[in-house]
From Swiss-Prot:
GO cellular component: plasma membrane; proton-transporting ATP synthase complex
Source species taxonomy: Bacteria, Pseudomonadati, Pseudomonadota, Alphaproteobacteria, Rhodobacterales
Ion transport in keyword set: yes
Gene Ontology terms, MF aspect: proton-transporting ATP synthase activity, rotational mechanism; proton-transporting ATPase activity, rotational mechanism
Function noted in UniProt: F(1)F(0) ATP synthase produces ATP from ADP in the presence of a proton or sodium gradient. F-type ATPases consist of two structural domains, F(1) containing the extramembraneous catalytic core and F(0) containing the membrane proton channel, linked together by a central stalk and a peripheral stalk. During catalysis, ATP synthesis in the catalytic domain of F(1) is coupled via a rotary mechanism of the central stalk subunits to proton translocation.
Membrane topology of the entry: Single-pass membrane protein
Principal place of residence: membrane
Gene: atpF2
Official protein name in the record: ATP synthase subunit b 2
Subunit structure as annotated in this protein's UniProt entry: F-type ATPases have 2 components, F(1) - the catalytic core - and F(0) - the membrane proton channel. F(1) has five subunits: alpha(3), beta(3), gamma(1), delta(1), epsilon(1). F(0) has three main subunits: a(1), b(2) and c(10-14). The alpha and beta chains form an alternating ring which encloses part of the gamma chain. F(1) is attached to F(0) by a central stalk formed by the gamma and epsilon chains, while a peripheral stalk is formed by the delta and b chains.
Species in which this protein is naturally found: Jannaschia sp. (strain CCS1)
The keyword Nucleotide-binding belongs to this UniProt entry's keyword annotation: no
Family according to the record: Belongs to the ATPase B chain family.
InterPro entries per record: ATP_synth_b/b'su_bac/chlpt, ATP_synthase_B_chain
HAMAP family named in the record: ATP_synth_b_bprime
Length: 193
């Protein structure tokens, strides 16, 4: 065991010596290591290698995925726009068919209203014609009665006038013979005008 302890002490001593040398190297280097011109070729190599690795990762992995997502979104947008245009066209067609149906319904309602008015007018005209015929019949009947009454009145008046004229002639000329035909002609001429 003693040998092991000596070996460990020797290893610690070597490690301490290495740390001391590293500390001495750090103490002797001026400022930041990125700005040390002695390490520029090594830094440029790793910079180019890193940029190439980033370029490879971007061009082979990231950009194709981004491009596919953009293409998918563009396709979705295009499909949505096409669907929106189709819906807009369908809405315009529906509105046009609605307006056409509304215009047809209005025309049909107007036609039905006109037919109803015409039918009512025809029925009214039939009733008016019927009433006119009844009025004309009653008027003709009334005129016939009036003519009959007038004829009866004239006949009665003529008869009364003949009787009165005969009596007047007898009163003025007692014992004279009365000419009934002459009295009747005189009364008829006077009554008829």
């Amino acid at each position: 065991m003693a040998d092991e302890a000596e070996t460990l002490d020797a290893a610690h001593g070597a490690t301490d010596a290495a740390h001391g040398a590293a500390d001495a190297a750090h103490a002797s280097s001026p400022g930041m290591p990125q700005l040390d011109f002695a390490t520029f070729p090594n830094q440029i190599f790793w910079l180019v290698l890193t940029l190439l690795a980033i370029y490879f990762v971007l061009t082979k992995i990231a950009l194709p995925r981004i491009s596919s997502v953009i293409a998918e979104r563009q396709g979705t947008l295009t499909n949505d726009l096409a669907a929106a245009e189709d819906l807009k066209r369908q809405a315009a067609e529906a509105e046009e068919s609605y307006n056409t149906a509304l215009a047809n319904a209005r025309a049909e309602a107007s036609r039905i209203a006109q037919e109803t008015r015409d039918e009512i007018q025809a029925q009214t005209q039939v009733e008016i014609d019927k009433a006119d015929a009844q009025i004309a019949a009653r008027t003709a009947e009334g005129e016939a009665r009036i003519a009959e009454i007038e004829a009866g009145a004239i006949a009665t008046a003529e008869e009364v006038a003949r009787d009165v004229a005969t009596e007047i002639v007898r009163a003025f000329g007692p014992g004279q013979d009365v000419d009934a035909a002459a009295v009747a002609d005189a009364v008829a001429n006077r009554v008829r005008g």
